[in-house]
Amino acid sequence: MEEIGILVEKIQDEIPALSVSRPQTGLSFLGPEPEDLEDLYSRYKKLQQELEFLEVQEEYIKDEQKNLKKEFLHAQEEVKRIQSIPLVIGQFLEAVDQNTAIVGSTTGSNYYVRILSTIDRELLKPNASVALHKHSNALVDVLPPEADSSIMMLTSDQKPDVMYADIGGMDIQKQEVREAVELPLTHFELYKQIGIDPPRGVLMYGPPGCGKTMLAKAVAHHTTAAFIRVVGSEFVQKYLGEGPRMVRDVFRLAKENAPAIIFIDEIDAIATKRFDAQTGADREVQRILLELLNQMDGFDQNVNVKVIMATNRADTLDPALLRPGRLDRKIEFPLPDRRQKRLIFSTITSKMNLSEEVDLEDYVARPDKISGADINSICQESGMLAVRENRYIVLAKDFEKAYKTVIKKDEQEHEFYK
């Protein structure tokens, strides 16, 4: 090295000494301390004990669930056994507490009874129909609102097929009924814009056979509203309280199916003038009238429910029923005059095969006081006389004989209805 001019020693002396140091990794190869191992083991044992306890609890809950299912099935069978026997229909009056109540039976007696634990307490409302056990009178079931009620609503296929065109004459009566019943149901906004309340009820009165019920049938045919028809005598029941309950059922059914029309025929059966009743039957009829007045006063104008009443004894009705606010419009159906007779004869005979010699004007001009039902009876009787002789044409002699037959039956005027 010296030969080539490189001095090694000097270079080595000049290079500083390098020191190599190991990096600090922080890893310990000696393992955890003994204290840490003891903590982990104790925690493991504790979790293992908790798992065993939860497994025991799971088994206990499964066994308890099986027992509860058995009890539930047994309770269901017991309820079915109780409900399988004939039950008594009653009326829920008042709840004493969660387990007992006061109910009324059809015999008029009230009972303090127990309530089956499976019954939904929200269904127990005053005057609700309930089923009572035959022997203990315990309340075992709640019947739907429409059960135990003789009030039925006419469906679309049960409505009468009588149209306004089938009713001869009575143009004024038709217009008044349609204004009071149909128009408020179809165009309520007209009354609201004018600022008046539509009529709540309509009373149709007049002698028998003048078309009151027939016009009500035409209203039922033409309207799309629900139509409920009852007769006044239906409210008079054997047991106390049944009549007022039926009145409530009628108006409840109408409100639930609004818009609706309630037609009460022969209203004089329950709405005669009140007096100092001496018998229980008279007092019950008066209670029915009071319930009817209460229901009509409770009408909400926003509920589209209209009431039509018909009678041939308007003079016997109670003044409280006739006052404005209950029956706002009173429509009279008098015996037909000459013009009305002509229209009724023309309407009824339009479908009949009459001979050319039949002069209807002759029968119209006769002074006999006859109703529309009498005219219909004359036409029907003349047709029956033609059938008796195997003819397809009704002759004038058939009409004459039929007229004498019908009028002879009604020779005496109806002084009762004047």
Curated annotation (Swiss-Prot):
SUPFAM superfamilies documented for this protein: P-loop containing nucleoside triphosphate hydrolases
Any GO BP annotation: blastocyst development
PANTHER family, per the entry: 26S PROTEASOME REGULATORY SUBUNIT
Name by which UniProt lists this protein: 26S proteasome regulatory subunit 6B
A Pfam family per the record: AAA_lid_3
CC annotations in GO: cytosolic proteasome complex; inclusion body; nucleus; proteasome accessory complex; proteasome complex; proteasome regulatory particle, base subcomplex
Modified residue annotations for N6-acetyllysine: 397, 401
Function as written in the Swiss-Prot or TrEMBL entry: Component of the 26S proteasome, a multiprotein complex involved in the ATP-dependent degradation of ubiquitinated proteins. This complex plays a key role in the maintenance of protein homeostasis by removing misfolded or damaged proteins, which could impair cellular functions, and by removing proteins whose functions are no longer required. Therefore, the proteasome participates in numerous cellular processes, including cell cycle progression, apoptosis, or DNA damage repair.
Gene, per the UniProt record: Psmc4
PROSITE patterns, sorted: AAA
Record: residues binding ATP: 206-213
Superkingdom of the source species: Eukaryota
Location of the protein in the cell: Cytoplasm; Nucleus
Keyword line: Acetylation, ATP-binding, Cytoplasm, Nucleotide-binding, Nucleus, Phosphoprotein, Proteasome
Phosphoserine PTM sites in chain numbering: 21, 28
PTM-bearing positions, type Phosphothreonine: 25
CDD domains to which the protein is assigned, alphabetical: RecA-like_PAN_like
Family of this protein: Belongs to the AAA ATPase family.
Residues recorded as bearing N-acetylmethionine in the entry: 1
UniProt entry tagged with the keyword Nucleotide-binding: yes
GO molecular function: ATP binding; ATP hydrolysis activity; proteasome-activating activity
Subunit structure, interactors included: Component of the 19S proteasome regulatory particle complex. The 26S proteasome consists of a 20S core particle (CP) and two 19S regulatory subunits (RP). The regulatory particle is made of a lid composed of 9 subunits, a base containing 6 ATPases including PSMC4 and few additional components. Interacts with NR1I3. Interacts with PAAF1. Interacts with TRIM5. Interacts with ZFAND1.
Organism: Rattus norvegicus
